[in-house]
Amino acid sequence: MATNPGLFTEWPWKKLGSFKYVLLAPWVAHGWYEVATKGWREVDLGYIAILPSLLLRMLHNQAWITISRLQNARGRRQIVRRGIEFDQVDRERNWDDQIILSGILLYLGALYVPGGQHLPLWRTDGAGLIALLHAGPVEFLYYWFHRALHHHFLYTHYHSHHHSSIVTEPITSVIHPFAELVAYELLFSIPLIACALTGTASIIAFEMYLIYIDFMNNMGHCNFELVPSWLFTWFPPLKYLMYTPSFHSLHHTQFRTNYSLFMPFYDYIYNTMDKSSDTLYENSLKNNEEEEAVDVVHLTHLTTLHSIYHMRPGFAEFASRPYVSRWYMRMMWPLSWLSMVLTWTYGSSFTVERNVMKKIRMQSWAIPRYSFHYGLDWEKEAINDLIEKAVCEADKNGAKVVSLGLLNQAHTLNKSGEQYLLKYPKLGARIVDGTSLAAAVVVNSIPQGTDQVILAGNVSKVARAVAQALCKKNIKVTMTNKQDYHLLKPEIPETVADNLSFSKTGTAKVWLIGDGLDSAEQFRAQKGTLFIPYSQFPPKMVRKDSCSYSTTPAMAVPKTLQNVHSCENWLPRRVMSAWRIAGILHALEGWNEHECGDKVLDMDKVWSAAIMHGFCPVAQG
């Protein structure tokens, strides 16, 4: 929102929410009616092509978002090395409003502008006219309009909304108040209307112009330099005809320079070009030599088939909210399956997120496999190779800690990471499975005054650590699985072993639950029971009517942890899993020991370190 919002700042269809697309429905329905009644030979192809054009533009914009987020996560060629937060993502979530507005104007033009009907596929003279009118009137008028927008009155009432984003993403380019974007649309319509009135319009030329505008807008705001220097060496005048991402980035950091739309020519002739433009461009290209140094690497993986859309490089709005299954995502199953196949064939981990806390630089890398892959025996060797390759690459890049998230630390897969330590005994990076902090979170989630709990579900390394800690606190732990009870009993110190017992039934109102707990067993719990998961994955909540469920082991992160603008799987905003935080603490504290295999660090020490650095228990709803 602008500093002091003026008239027509809000979009008129804001209250429609996701139903705003119905605004285009009458024209879309009319188009299909025309096809049904007249046939493809008689119908106006230009009118019919508007809907595919809008869909293509949305895909084009999404591609830029994904590429930009992947590139900026790696830190290569990055221009502004600062983070963004959730408020920017929320502010820019309505980027498709511009597509809807453009669609409405295109439909109106195709119906009512003279010469806008029954356009041919291509006319060279029309394409040339569009290029000339854009380079002349459009660029000239935009330059002076843009300068006017930086006048105090217009800036505070309108343009400050766009400049709220210092660190830009591709789609920042179309985040403006409604009135301002209407003015831009009218400006860009000059070449199109001129072609229609002169009888030189064509479908392909119009589409190329729209794609050109989207491409240049996205490129200018992507926050990484991608224009190679050899282009300007080969054709020097290009410097005045095409801006670069670093050129426009200076406009967002300096505000009073580099006003041009896409052609810096006007900044040169009116002496508003930032003097550091060339230097920033060259320095941004130099960042290509090597990826940004990293201290902590967290290895995660894809979960469900649709989880790829919820990762940071996916759909920004989905990534900014806890993962939930949405019915309409099922309609994207062809793309989901294609993504799975492409991911499965990809032979290396990829960077999905970059964070900074104090002087510690962190990255999250995703192993290109889904959760179901980890349950396939014939996939285990390939998955281990991928994790091993990632660990070695992180170590080569100077990482101090590699934390294993989700199923990447499964005991049946790699003995909680110990397999890599045995293979590479001189490994510089510390391997951390996060058991101590995960167990500490579970123990500290138990309400004060609790004297007995029930432990149900598969007994993992975390479950064993929790059981030992609770028995030492003289809290009675009742297990519901006899076989697991006999396996765990010898691991409890003799002095407190009586605190661990087996029973098919129990009266405790606190259940510590893990994977493998079925619905029937949950229904054996009393009303008012608190279920606290110790597993990586959330349990199926079948007792929401009378019981409550905690999140999987996690903590809220402090404000000093920056560039957090996506949710970690199903966790709330600015909440991270204990396994991920454990790696961060390892680096912050400078601990030199591994936590893998059967090794568990001192839970009290790890918990105290987490609290000291500002991590907080998650408030349960």
Curated annotation (Swiss-Prot):
What class does this enzyme belong to in the EC scheme? lyase
Please give the biological process terms from Gene Ontology that the record holds: anther development; anther wall tapetum development; cuticle development; cutin biosynthetic process; pollen exine formation; response to abscisic acid; response to salt stress; wax biosynthetic process
Provide the phenotype resulting from gene inactivation: Male-sterile plants characterized by small and white anthers lacking mature pollen grains. Defects in the biosynthesis of very-long-chain fatty acids (including polyesters) in cuticles and in the innermost layer of the anther wall (the tapetum). Lack of epicuticular wax crystals in the outer layer of the anther and severely retarded microspore development and finally disrupted as a result of defective pollen exine formation.
Q: What does this protein do?
A: Aldehyde decarbonylase involved in the conversion of aldehydes to alkanes. Core component of a very-long-chain alkane synthesis complex. Required for the biosynthesis of very-long-chain fatty acids (including polyesters) in cuticles, anther tapetum and pollen exine.
Q: What is this protein called?
A: Very-long-chain aldehyde decarbonylase GL1-5
User: Which species is listed as the source?
Assistant: Oryza sativa subsp. japonica
Q: Which family does it belong to?
A: Belongs to the sterol desaturase family.
Its tissue distribution reads: Expressed in panicles, developing spikelets, stamens and hulls and, at low levels, in roots, developing seeds, flag leaves and seedling shoots. Strongly expressed in the epidermal cells of anthers.
EC number annotated for this UniProt entry: 4.1.99.5
Cited InterPro entries: CER1-like_C, Fatty_acid_hydroxylase, Sterol_Desaturase_Related
A Gene Ontology molecular function term of the record:
oxidoreductase activity
Query: Could you tell me where this protein is found in the cell?
Result: Endoplasmic reticulum membrane
Q: Under the cellular component aspect of Gene Ontology, which terms does the record hold?
A: endoplasmic reticulum; endoplasmic reticulum membrane; exine
State how it assembles.
Answer: Homodimer.
What main location does UniProt list? endoplasmic reticulum
Any single Pfam family the record assigns to this protein = FA_hydroxylase
Q: Which reaction does it catalyse?
A: a long-chain fatty aldehyde + 2 NADPH + O2 + H(+) = a long-chain alkane + formate + 2 NADP(+) + H2O
Superkingdom of this protein's organism: Eukaryota
Residue ranges of domain Fatty acid hydroxylase in the record: 138-272
Induction notes from the record:
Induced by salt stress and abscisic acid (ABA).
Q: Where does the chain cross the membrane?
A: 99-119, 126-146, 186-206, 224-244, 332-352
Q: What membrane topology was assigned to this protein in its record?
A: Multi-pass membrane protein
| Phylogenetic classification of the source organism | Eukaryota, Viridiplantae, Streptophyta, Embryophyta, Tracheophyta
Keywords assigned by UniProt, alphabetized: Endoplasmic reticulum, Lyase, Membrane, NADP, Transmembrane, Transmembrane helix
Q: Signal peptide position in this chain?
A: none
